[in-house]
Amino acid sequence: MNRYYFIKKFDQSHIDKQDKKTIIIFRNYNQDIDEKLILTIKNYCKKKGNKFLISNNIKLAIKLNLDGAYIPSFNKDKKHLSYSVRKSFIILGSAHNVYEMRTKELQNVNAIFLSSIFKKNKNYLGINKFKSLSLLSNKPFIALG
């Protein structure tokens, strides 16, 4: 079973603490994307044996030959469906409700992060609602705190 670790910046010590089954996802919406930084993280993850995904930019993930991309819940775009990607390219998405789940299915993601299970924010689902929603799709689900 894979684990997922979201990062906002490159900090080797955080990646070093992860095992090889942990997929690293770079997600920082507060700054412009620095391709050089992305390549640095990619190369470090490769050296450590971790897969590396970037958030909300499938085109760049393909261009930089990353392991995949993560599509956040607010992204409804389906342009990437026309892109040619290798078979092992991973596309993950996140959702908070049935509408967003259906959008992620139409975006043809490999798995859906469903959040949040615990009462931390306005998108709180709880365990029972998580179970109910996860029965509505054949896609694999990943519970987010």
Over which residues does each language-model region extend?
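Glycine-rich adenosine-cofactor-binding loop
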Residues: 94-95, 126-145
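Broad hydrophobic/π-residue packing in well-ordered secondary structure
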Residues: 37, 68, 111, 118, ...
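Short flexible/disordered coil segments
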Residues: 87-91, 114-119, 133
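Glycine-rich phosphate-binding active-site loops on the catalytic face of alpha/beta enzymes
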Residues: 72-81, 113-126, 144
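Conserved N-terminal beta1-alpha1 strand-loop-helix module at the mouth
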Residues: 1-78, 83-110, 138-139
